Amino acid sequence: MDIIAKLRDVSFDELHPNERLKVDSHYLYGTLEESLADRATGAVSDADTQLTKFHGFYQQDDRDLRDDRRHRKLEPLYSFMVRLRLPGGRVSPEQWLTLDDNARRYANGTLRITTRQTFQYHGVFKENLRGHLQALDKAMMDTIAACGDVNRNVICTANPHRSPIHRQVHDLAHEISAHLLPRTRAYHEIFLGEERVAGGPREAEDEVEPLYTRHYLPRKFKVALAIPPENDVDVFAHDVGFIADVQAGELKGFNVCIGGGMGMTHGEPATFPRLSDIVGYCTPDRVVAVAEAIMLVQRDNGNRHDRKQARLKYTVEALGVDGFRQEVEARLGEALSPARELTLTHNGDRLGWYQGEDGLWHYGLFVQNGRLADSDGGPQLMTGMREIAQAHDGDIVLTTNQNLIITQVPEARREVIDDLLDRYRMTVEATPLRRHAMACVAFPTCGLAMAESERYLPSLIDRLDAIMREAGLADDAIIVRMTGCPNGCARPYLAEIGFVGKTIGRYNLYLGGGFAGERLNKLYRENIDEATILEELTPLIRRYAVEREPGEAFGDFVVRTGIIAPTLAGREFHA
């Protein structure tokens, strides 16, 4: 039974309030035009704060200033975080210059690379939203469905110019994104000035959204594509994963994974991170159809009563893996083929110069926590990348580890890129520990943050690096991730060492994730400060240096030696 039939006789009083809001919005229009016109406040209406997400931006305020403004009887300093839809993370030099100009003209002067291979702008005031989005549109970019209860930015193993296989997989990411994009014209009419046609979306029936209907999805929906042996995308962490089967240089098909997701809520064991299950195999020409079928099963069966139980991972738990797969196959009209043996061996990005199969060169640039900014006395990443975009003809590609790649550089032009990297101090030395670390934004802009993350992790890495050097592990990588709340944006539950904020200056410490993103970690210590973090980790790192087996990763070591029990399934995460 589809969602329209299922909800026909259900009272909205039985559902989460967002379900009525979506239906009453008339395909995401709501009262956004009125909210944008209201100059008495920097905010939009309460209902519209939910609808802006579908259009790619969140209302936030500067939490560093919140108490001071309250004391002065001023409303919070509202602004918006604006996120791009950028499947596969590729932009041209011309598009980069637009991104750079928008950051300086409409936002806080920085760009933030996300763990979903796109950009976020912070500090965009309400009066600047239309100008910002219209400038992006002129450069053939948009923010549609970058947030909200829809298919989010589709990610894939980075750099389509590395090989023909990478290009094919990148193109599939674009096809999935285009196919699962909402069809309403609300974004174009409200923000881009497109003229509304009489009898348009506000009067139409559900054919406006043939896939989503007026109900849209119960929660966000995320898709990732990986090319073994690399698992840079953490393919098991998403609602849907496709793992490429490459034989003799030919893309034969994909293993299909369902049911991953990171978010949970502190103190609520019914919520948990979960890794996806491999349920079958499909050929490249069926990838889009499979993605659609999985999304429709979630649309029609996901929990619309409790948003904390609304992600696809909980639908898989409710229906069972086999039951969910059978629903997918019923919509496909065919069975998935048996999965193939495909091996993922490592996470992380290729940094520095490397050569593609066509002979052109690519430079992987480390960007600490994804923040592109000009720092006093340090890297001038915004200015440097602007200069590179002006001097370079090839694409710039983002990674899901918050780094970027300057692609398609001829041998004769490498010196030009090297000179610019040096001039703007962009190639800072970073240890393997730092290169494999990720943090979410958290304070001051994220309204969900309970503790610092991006602003704090670099200094904590300094202290952990000192412990690593003392133990003789300066050249070894351990995956460290931090988030300011339990929602999991930096995928901390896959880290070998994960930190999740509890309150200001205190974190839950998780250990035992798999180095290749194949195993969840588990809670080791709760609600601890930095001194306790270092007290706990120092002896473990020293033991690892002495007792590890050849080639053994830290996460595997702490599991093998009984320091932490392995998490073998999401529902066992809290056990």
Curated annotation (Swiss-Prot):
InterPro entries xrefs: CysI, NiRdtase/SiRdtase_haem-b_fer, Nit/Sulf_reduc_fer-like_dom_sf, NO2/SO3_Rdtase_4Fe4S_dom, NO2/SO3_Rdtase_4Fe4S_prot, NO2/SO3_Rdtase_4Fe4S_sf, NO2/SO3_Rdtase_FeS/sirohaem_BS
Chain residues that bind [4Fe-4S] cluster: 440, 446, 485, 489
EC top class, as a word: oxidoreductase
Annotated metabolic or biological route of this protein: Sulfur metabolism; hydrogen sulfide biosynthesis; hydrogen sulfide from sulfite (NADPH route): step 1/1
One of the record's GO cellular component terms: sulfite reductase complex (NADPH)
Enzyme Commission (EC) number: 1.8.1.2
GO MF annotation: an example: sulfite reductase (ferredoxin) activity
Cofactors: siroheme; [4Fe-4S] cluster
GO BP terms: cysteine biosynthetic process; hydrogen sulfide biosynthetic process; sulfate assimilation
Segments crossing the lipid bilayer: none
Keywords: 4Fe-4S, Amino-acid biosynthesis, Cysteine biosynthesis, Heme, Iron, Iron-sulfur, Metal-binding, NADP, Oxidoreductase
Reactions this protein catalyses: hydrogen sulfide + 3 NADP(+) + 3 H2O = sulfite + 3 NADPH + 4 H(+)
Binding site for siroheme: 489
Cofactor remark: Binds 1 siroheme per subunit. Binds 1 [4Fe-4S] cluster per subunit.
Highest taxon of source: Bacteria
One Pfam family cited in the UniProt record for this chain: NIR_SIR
SUPFAM superfamilies: Nitrite and sulphite reductase 4Fe-4S domain-like, Nitrite/Sulfite reductase N-terminal domain-like
Function: Component of the sulfite reductase complex that catalyzes the 6-electron reduction of sulfite to sulfide. This is one of several activities required for the biosynthesis of L-cysteine from sulfate.
Stated family: Belongs to the nitrite and sulfite reductase 4Fe-4S domain family.
Assembly notes: Alpha(8)-beta(8). The alpha component is a flavoprotein, the beta component is a hemoprotein.
HAMAP family for the chain: CysI (MF_01540)
Stated name of the protein: Sulfite reductase [NADPH] hemoprotein beta-component
Organism: Chromohalobacter salexigens (strain ATCC BAA-138 / DSM 3043 / CIP 106854 / NCIMB 13768 / 1H11)
